[in-house]
Swiss-Prot record:
Cellular component annotations (GO), alphabetically ordered: cytoplasm; endopeptidase Clp complex
Organism: Shouchella clausii (strain KSM-K16) (Alkalihalobacillus clausii)
CDD domains: S14_ClpP_2
Keyword Transport set for record: no
Annotated catalysed reactions: Hydrolysis of proteins to small peptides in the presence of ATP and magnesium. alpha-casein is the usual test substrate. In the absence of ATP, only oligopeptides shorter than five residues are hydrolyzed (such as succinyl-Leu-Tyr-|-NHMec, and Leu-Tyr-Leu-|-Tyr-Trp, in which cleavage of the -Tyr-|-Leu- and -Tyr-|-Trp bonds also occurs)
E.C. number: 3.4.21.92
Subunit structure: Fourteen ClpP subunits assemble into 2 heptameric rings which stack back to back to give a disk-like structure with a central cavity, resembling the structure of eukaryotic proteasomes.
Primary location class: cytoplasm
Protein name (database record): ATP-dependent Clp protease proteolytic subunit 2
Gene Ontology terms for molecular function: ATP-dependent peptidase activity; ATPase binding; serine-type endopeptidase activity
A GO BP annotation: protein quality control for misfolded or incompletely synthesized proteins
Keywords: Cytoplasm, Hydrolase, Protease, Serine protease
Family the entry assigns: Belongs to the peptidase S14 family.
Subcellular location: Cytoplasm
Amino acid sequence: MNLIPTVIEQTNRGERAYDIYSRLLKDRIIMLGSGVDDNVANSIVAQMLFLQAEDPEKDISLYINSPGGSITAGMAIYDTMQFIKPDVSTICIGMAASMGAFLLTAGAKGKRMALPNSEVMIHQPLGGMQGQAADMEIHARRIIQMREKLNQIMAERSGQPYERIARDTDRDNFMTAEQAKEYGLIDKVIETPTK
């Protein structure tokens, strides 16, 4: 069951009901709270394009709590983040794993953040295939090409040498928010404000 909360807002024309994600979008907040597939990517890309049309000078915030997912779907989000004029700040809440970690690192430099108890996990692309040996070989080569492309982008975005990224993504590599900051995947850990 997928329950989406509704919020009621008072306006000069009366009450207005929004689903929570539409209300957050008014404040230029986009949520990635699931695996990354084509439908999720299309929704996020559309929201980014909409917000750019609304105000190309104002930042967009992308909150990430994702186990990762499809490389091609994630690259659609990544390319859009780099293409649009507004800076996209990224904030890890909970877990940013695999493609979720890649998108976290893709945020505007200086605007990549994580909450103190969140985690980041990087690893090499996963793939499963079946069929004729020749087709499996084609798919294996494609996964290796994608791994090299992702590692190159991660190296550029984190400031780490390509060789270290390749070594550190060979297996699942979990990091605390502070470790992700030291590694260069994010720029700051957001501390809970004191009252």
